[in-house]
């Protein structure tokens, strides 16, 4: 089974998937993250990736995040800043690439905020999870949207505001997701979330073999 991580960053998804026996390729435009292939996904040729079974796509969330609401990147549903226009184009290019390689399963991840409002995701299946459900201890809740084609056997785990498993983070506070020191820390996908999805994918692709 072969997997592809677009916008791999910390490569936590690939670490989880490799531990389950999936052969991974990581792609990121930032050379500091040391991906297998350093480039923008806009520059990829779908013909080179026709054997991919599963894709994880993590586009930059900067203009879509709750913390960017006051910056006015969008007005009445229209991207008005150069940053928002570039982000929309980048996400659409990633989705076009995924459709072109047509993997059995794929997921695009972004915090629960403005990406879900963009017109180019309205026809996609969407699930919402809480990151605190996939990490040990008391951690930020970080509600996160997952778009794409996921296995029917996989069940998203969603928490509720005020639950004791995560750090309280009223809007405007500096706890919760806002309390992470860097954007890279905020972007790390929980290992167990990635692993739970991959286990379900493998189970369905192998006719019910349970992990």
Task: Show the residue positions of the predicted features.
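Class I S-adenosyl-L-methionine
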Residues: 6, 38, 44-52, 61-211
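SAM cofactor-binding core of SAM-dependent methyltransferases
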Residues: 2-47, 53-56, 63-64
């Amino acid at each position: 089974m072969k997997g592809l991580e677009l916008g791999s960053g910390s490569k936590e998804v690939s670490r989880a998937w490799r531990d389950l026996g999936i052969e991974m390729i990581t792609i990121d435009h930032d050379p500091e993250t040391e991906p297998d292939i350093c480039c923008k996904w806009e520059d990829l040729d779908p013909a080179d990736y026709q054997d991919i079974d599963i894709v994880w796509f993590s586009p930059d969330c900067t203009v879509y995040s709750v913390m960017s609401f006051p910056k006015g990147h969008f007005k009445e549903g229209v991207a008005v800043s150069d940053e928002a226009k570039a982000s929309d184009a980048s996400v659409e290019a990633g989705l076009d690439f995924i459709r072109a390689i047509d993997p059995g399963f794929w997921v695009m991840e972004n915090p629960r905020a403005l990406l879900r409002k963009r017109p180019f995701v309205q026809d996609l299946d969407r699930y919402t999870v809480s990151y605190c459900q996939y990490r040990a201890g008391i951690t930020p809740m970080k509600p996160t949207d997952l778009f794409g084609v996921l296995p029917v056997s996989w069940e998203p785990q969603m928490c509720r505001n005020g639950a004791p498993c995560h750090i309280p983070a009223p809007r405007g506070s500096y706890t919760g997701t806002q309390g992470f020191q860097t954007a890279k820390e905020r972007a790390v996908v929980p290992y167990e979330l990635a692993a739970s999805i991959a286990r379900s994918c493998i189970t369905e692709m192998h006719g019910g073999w349970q992990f």
